[in-house]
Amino acid sequence: LELKAAETPLPAEKADAALVDKAWRAMTDVHQFFGLLKLHYLSRQQAFRLVGDDLACQVENNALALLLETARQHGNEIMIFVGNRGCVQIFTGAVEKVVPMKGWLNIFNPTFTLHLLEETIAESWVTRKPTADGHVTSLELFAADGTQIAQLYGQRTEGEPEQSQWRSQIDALTPKGLAA
């Protein structure tokens, strides 16, 4: 077994922003995003910075806490992806109990527990990826070194549009640097 180091993306200034934006808008499935990144030698965050704000917009880092509490209050089902290079855990369902404690944001559900140290969130992005069923909207969280911490989506079934409630909850988040 031979291990290979992860490919290092090129600096974003070498990428063609118009081409990346055009390719993003042409997607018909969220999974095509991985191919877009590979084709243009980009990290997720580099791609986010290259496209229009309607596709990727940086939001304040308190977005996770706000979104989880709103989803809990409304009871709509969400998906939370947390992973690393070797493993991904996916939660799908309604968030039942959110407990902030000593800098940690905790979710306590009967079948899912998450403990996230809020100060480790360096960047938070709302992204919209086109699919054959309309846009799929997510909140993506990153550490200072660019490592992805988590992705959140409204629960949806392939072939169905995104929850309008989820979209409204995401749209309520404040873009970074703008007053609420």
Residues of each region from the PLM?
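Long, positively charged binding patches that form subdomain-scale interaction surfaces
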Residues: 38-103, 107-108
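Mixed-charge (acidic/basic) macromolecular-recognition segments
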Residues: 1-54, 159, 170-180
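Alpha-helix initiation/capping motif
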Residues: 16, 43-44, 59-60, 117, ...
